[in-house]
């Protein structure tokens, strides 16, 4: 078996009747939104690029560098002085080289390889939404929400038993840094935190009403993730892992579906400064799947997002991220990356994943989540790696590979969709919110716990899971991935599969 390679790793969408090998990647596209029009106005010149300039620590350094930006042919869009990151637009092809020579600049680089767009339209791949008949047919057990019987993933992490003890605290907020969240959904509205929600697509916060929502033709990915985390236990639809906590939407994906550095930096800083306890990051930062430290542009992107994620953790947030969907061994000596840069013309390259990092997934302090299917083994697509994958949780898999027990019918993960609907998706994008939900339950149980303590409890309470050996998920007689490590910690499952019951009882 070979792993499917989706253009957008963070947004694998699998219609319920399709095998993983033919999975559709989300292409969240639409015309430019109001938030993007500001960016377009700055970038009327089609050759303009966006940059991040990372300033060395020091009194007055940021002000000095901002003046130098103008002299180098750039325009400051916004500046995050608290972490020393400046977002710049420039049409000068030598801008990065020039600004790197300025005293006080640690690193600088283009956040993309394609010019800033003025407007974009394209097609959209969608998940399979449940029909009205399917919703009506679902039979719930006493005390369950109507669609909960289809959620095999909840008992897989003992969330159903956890809910008998605690639903989580409304004082805890999980931020979904993603494609936007439809807060009008009946399963999301009761738990939505508007004050911690924002649109960061341009790299600058847009707090206008509803700016955090996906457009009508944009990806439902973020809404799906939000429901997995905190869909209310309210007699409607489905139930989230932590149905008593708050969830916010931080939109960082542009109309083309790209998660650029300036938007991701904005998202982490916003979360840091608005009381967020957990961030969920089911994406990788475009346009490079791996950002190499020996490339000046990629190093700048790595520096900027590292500063932002560390700032969020310093302010009290646990950062959780999806491991990725290419069946890569992230602990291997080398990986062949055929997809970067994904916003222009990709070229095949061989990278060392210890020096070229998937961000934010491989950043220090980030909880990296691998995916399991309905049989509790590694999903066919899930990235893995000893010392890289920290923990595992249900992200689904092709029903042909891992079929759930009745009454559940799909091996994929049920979630909320915009417009008051529910539907299935699969990917490490779906595994990560399960862990974010468990982290929120731990924070609810231990309200004064630091991010370090929450992570320590998350790992200690995970159910140790031994390597699946040999791993031949499609039963073709060929090994599809090799798991290294012990039962207590290995490359497929990290410290184990997340445990929601322990999160509320220990």
Name every feature range the model reports, one short phrase each.
Residues 142-244, 266, 273-300, 325-340, ...:
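Active-site core segment of subtilase-fold serine proteases
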Residues 1-35:
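Secretory targeting and sorting signals
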Residues 252-359, 363, 416-434, 489-490:
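Substrate-binding/access-modulating region of protease and related hydrolase catalytic domains
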Residues 34-44, 77, 276-284, 446-506:
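C-terminal subdomain of the subtilisin-like protease fold in secreted/lumenal serine endopeptidases
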Residues 72, 105, 169-173, 243-248, ...:
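Loop/turn elements at helix/coil->beta-strand transitions in domains of secreted/extracellular proteins
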Residues 343-441, 498-505:
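Extracellular S/T/G-rich loop segment that most often corresponds to the catalytic His/Ser-adjacent loop
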Residues 4, 40, 66-148:
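Autoinhibitory propeptides
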Residues 45-55:
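Short glycine-/aliphatic-rich beta-strand segments at the starts of folded cytosolic domains
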